[in-house]
Regions:
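A phosphate-binding catalytic loop at a beta-strand-loop-alpha-helix junction
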Residues: 126-143
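Cysteine-dependent PTP/DSP-like catalytic domain, specifically the C-terminal lobe
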Residues: 141-143, 147-193
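Conserved beta-strand elements of beta-rich interaction domains across eukaryotes
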Residues: 55, 61-63, 81-84, 98-103, ...
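Non-catalytic regulatory/accessory regions that flank a structured catalytic core
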Residues: 1-50, 54, 183-196
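Eukaryotic beta-rich interaction modules
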Residues: 32-41, 46-80, 109-114
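Short loop/helix-cap segments at secondary-structure boundaries that form the rim of catalytic
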Residues: 68, 83-91
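Active-site regions of enzymes building and remodeling cell-envelope glycoconjugates
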Residues: 89-99
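Helix-loop module immediately N-terminal to the HCX5R catalytic loop
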Residues: 97-127
Length: 196
């Protein structure tokens, strides 16, 4: 699987790379590829409502005070090393300083992020979970929350979040950690059944 910097890539670059990989000309699909790129880029700019109280988005959503206020967001989970909290005097933050690398240990923070999101929900507030682009770190965190909060299997949680935000792509390391998290949740369910 190839990766590109979405801040630098153009639809032409994508088309040429696909042509190279497929060894065929795609000129007649130029408009289609451009439209699909615009859909993906638009999803990345706009936050996605995953649940009535939970939004998944980017650093741009996190710095848009008007949007935050209009959506009743009083809690923010910032899952980045590189983006600082924009409104610490006005909003409640949970800052998880991690990089988007397969070797990054994100699982150890999920109990903390799940509690924080649940607190926002219980207080009748909305919460934004964001990383830089709303694709990997933050989506993994939201998927982990959905699994814990709703008792969903990993596949169901990924499907739900992907249906709401089509551009999510947790890195392979985070997917492995989500599988581990699913296993620990399953063990806890079995333990509860045995002790009741």
């Amino acid at each position: 699987m190839q990766t590109v910097d979405l801040d630098e890539v153009t639809s032409r670059d994508i088309r040429l790379k696909v042509e190279e990989t497929m060894r065929m000309k795609l000129d007649k699909y130029k408009d289609f590829i451009s439209r699909q790129m615009m859909v993906i880029m638009g999803q990345m700019d706009k936050a996605s409502q995953i649940f009535p109280y939970l939004y998944l988005g980017t650093e741009w959503n996190a710095c848009d005070w008007q949007w935050l206020e209009n959506n009743g967001i009083k809690y923010i989970v910032n899952v980045t090393n590189e983006v600082e909290n924009f409104f610490p005097a006005r909003l409640k933050y949970l800052k998880i300083r991690v990089s988007d690398e397969a070797s990054t240990e994100l699982l150890k923070y999920w109990n903390q992020t799940n509690q924080f999101i649940k607190e926002a929900k219980e207080k009748g507030s909305s919460v934004l979970v964001h990383c830089k682009k709303g694709i990997s770190r933050s989506s993994s965190t939201v998927i982990a929350f959905a699994m814990k909060e709703y008792g969903w299997a990993l596949s169901q949680a990924i499907e739900h979040v992907k249906n709401k935000r089509g551009c999510i792509t947790p890195n392979i390391g985070f997917v492995e950690q989500l599988r581990t998290f699913e296993g620990s949740l399953d063990k806890f369910k079995i333990y509860l059944c045995l002790t009741l």
